[in-house]
Amino acid sequence: MKILPVGSRFCPTDLGLVRLYLRNKVERNQSSFITTMDIHQDYPWLLPHVNNPLFNNNEWYYFVPLTERGGKILSVHRKVAARGGSEGGTWRSNDGKKEIKDGHMQKGDGLRASDDLQKVVLCRIRYKKEANVNEFGLVNHQAHQTQDALTGFADQLEMMLEGQEDREQKEEADLTGFADSLETMLEGQEDHEQPEDADLTGFADSLETMLEGHEDREQPEEAELTVTQQQQQQQQQQQRQEDCDVTQEQEKDDVMVLINNPNDALALGNYEIIDLTRVDK
């Protein structure tokens, strides 16, 4: 096998595929590095694709043999049987029929196709993410995948909604229980406040009674104090009267002494009286 430079890629034109590779396969049975395989035997993603470094990514080339479909008509059996959970499908070409012409051929020249030239075809498969599974993909595959995805999503959504309903019912039950507990607490608080109000009322009544009794006691005490003060005032007045009488009596005695001894000096307390009218000889 010829060794190609590193980085070489198999990028033939449609005309090159027909003139070189398909013609060599039909006339000389030379397939080079293109494998012969019935690509319609299974799903495209389950085929034993070759790993050829010359092919571009997600691109493959195969020689596909034709089969008889009644009489001498040769065609490709495109149906894929059901497998697993899939209902099967049909291969189809996305490009349709396209004529490949050699620009060097002149008008009138042609090649009559014999039966031998119709026993094999050259197929190119490409994987397209945004479009179909591949250029010759199954028609029903994407529909089944979409249906399965929608069914799974619907099941998940239903489970989520059921879980949401269960959570809402639980939250509602919790709120109901909390409301009942709160109501019970408030009722207990009211029952507790009523005895406290009664106790405060009784305490106020007792305090009022005590104050009234204290006032009643203060009134006799004030009356007793008034009588005592009057008695003290009378005693003080009597004492002052007695002192006044004593003073008057003492003054009378002093006058009598002065009268009886007019020429003598008398010492009366701290006072000394001298008779200046007397002259010593």
UniProtKB/Swiss-Prot annotation:
- Where does the record place the region Disordered? 84-109, 211-249
Report if keyword S-adenosyl-L-methionine is assigned.
no
Q: What is one Pfam family matched by this protein?
A: NAM
What is the primary gene name for this protein? NAC006
The written remark on domains in the entry is: The NAC domain includes a DNA-binding domain and a dimerization domain.
Q: Which residues form the NAC domain?
A: 4-156
| Protein's recorded name | NAC domain-containing protein 6
Q: InterPro entries this protein is in?
A: NAC-dom, NAC_dom_sf
- Single Gene Ontology MF annotation: DNA-binding transcription factor activity
